[in-house]
């Protein structure tokens, strides 16, 4: 089972405050573990514009029509002082990895330098930190019914209102997340 480019959808029973009602976009999943970004937990009153200002990134060719008041997300509890940028594919960034034909992750500053300009990727999600699972941990959590999984959807990742992402991700499975039980039967 490879869950790269999938969403993890927290079951209603998952009460860990870091992951309660979370949707995690899985960037990498292999025999060593998994890495993902929470896509529906914004950092309170912290925007992409704040990040650029704090890093003193002020592109000369800034396009005022491009909004930078988008939220920055709490991607997870690990390396929460580092930025992780999910975006639609675009060449030319120093530390980019293709996750799927529709999505890349970049950790280098050069992607931030394009934000607010005509050179920025079409869709961008900026997060601080990431979520990680060591070898076998995510698989155990799945067996314990902590998460649902579904293939990722770019519309949910980049365009669905933040407060609706948990519910909408579950809807891709044909379920109402509020009406499911957290216990699975075993025959």
From Swiss-Prot:
Sorted alphabetically, which InterPro entries does this protein's record hold?
Answer: AlgH-like
GO cellular component entries? cytosol
Q: Which PANTHER family match?
A: UNCHARACTERIZED PROTEIN YQGE (PTHR30327), UPF0301 PROTEIN YQGE (PTHR30327:SF1)
Family note: Belongs to the UPF0301 (AlgH) family.
UniProt-listed HAMAP family? UPF0301
This protein is called UPF0301 protein SG2023
Where are its TM segments located?
none
């Amino acid at each position: 089972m490879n869950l790269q480019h999938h969403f993890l959808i927290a079951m209603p029973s998952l009460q860990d405050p870091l992951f309660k009602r979370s949707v995690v976009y899985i960037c990498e999943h292999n025999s060593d573990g998994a890495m993902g970004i929470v896509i529906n937990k914004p950092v309170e009153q912290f925007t992409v514009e704040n990040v650029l200002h704090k890093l003193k990134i002020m592109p000369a060719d800034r396009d005022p029509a491009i909004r930078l008041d988008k939220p920055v997300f709490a991607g997870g509890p690990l390396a929460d002082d580092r930025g992780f940028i999910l975006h639609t594919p675009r060449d030319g960034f120093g530390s980019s990895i293709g996750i799927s034909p529709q999505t890349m992750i970049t950790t280098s500053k050069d992607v931030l330098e394009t934000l607010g300009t005509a050179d920025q990727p079409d869709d961008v999600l900026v997060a601080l930190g990431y979520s990680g699972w060591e070898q076998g941990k995510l698989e155990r959590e799945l067996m314990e019914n902590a998460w649902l999984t579904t293939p990722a959807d770019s519309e949910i990742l980049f365009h669905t209102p933040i407060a609706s992402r948990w519910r909408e991700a579950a809807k891709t499975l044909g379920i109402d997340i509020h009406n499911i039980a957290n216990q699975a039967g075993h025959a």
